Amino acid sequence: MKLESSAELSQTTAPGEVFLGAVSDFTSAVPMEVATNPAIAFSTVNQGKLTFNAPPEVVARYFDDHQGWFARCAAPMQVQPMGQNGYTLVIGRFGSFGYEVEPKVGLEMKSHLPGMYTIESIPLPEDGELGYEVDFRSTMQLVEGHNNTVTYAEWKLDLKANVRFPQFIYTLPKGLIQKTGDRLLNQIVKQVSHRLNQKVVDDFHQNYSTQ
């Protein structure tokens, strides 16, 4: 796996590598050949925990104010607001077997109960032209730690992606495509979530924990 800055995105990457970074613009529509090919389903489930040195009510105010930090913490991924609680997020580039894609996804963050949040995928206007569909479902719960001075944000992500490939990909063994796609999806989620989680924790302690 390879993480790249926006300046490195034009470099050649060997087949089978994953590469992520900032992109100059949102993904354009895929060729008609790809859009009409049968989709292959990939999935991954991940979970983790963030630690904040503050009481739950302070951490909750931070997450409720996600318009103030989400885009900043998601960088170098490209973010555009969608309504009050939604965002269009361009993840970067990734690929395998010589095929590359720059995916974007619509996400909406909501608080249903105090200290409980969901992030779910929402439709994009051009969904039917992208060559893939993403089903993103994440839950997060704030848990009070020792003496009300520490808060844990426990999260779980269930991610499914249906991807349409160029015709030459379908000549490969189906089991190889499935195994490689699931593995790459899992690696991408782990890499992105690790970076985003760390940046959120750092951002909170630098800008919000004393409020």
Regions found by a protein language model. Give the residues of each.
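Hydrophobic ligand-binding cavity/cleft-lining segments
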Residues: K2-E100, G106
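Hydrophobic-ligand binding "helix-grip"
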Residues: K2-E4, E100-Y152
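N-terminal plastid-targeting presequences
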Residues: P31, T36, P114-T118, N147-T149, ...
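Solvent-exposed residues in well-ordered beta-strands and their adjoining turns
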Residues: T51-P55, G92-F94, K110-H112, Q141-V143, ...
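Short, intrinsically disordered, mixed-charge
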Residues: R61-G68, A75, H112, K190, ...
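Generic short beta-strand segments
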Residues: G86-F94, E120-L124, L159-K160
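Beta-strand/loop substructures that line and gate deep hydrophobic ligand-binding cavities in soluble
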Residues: G128-D182
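A conserved amphipathic terminal alpha-helix motif
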Residues: Y170-Q211
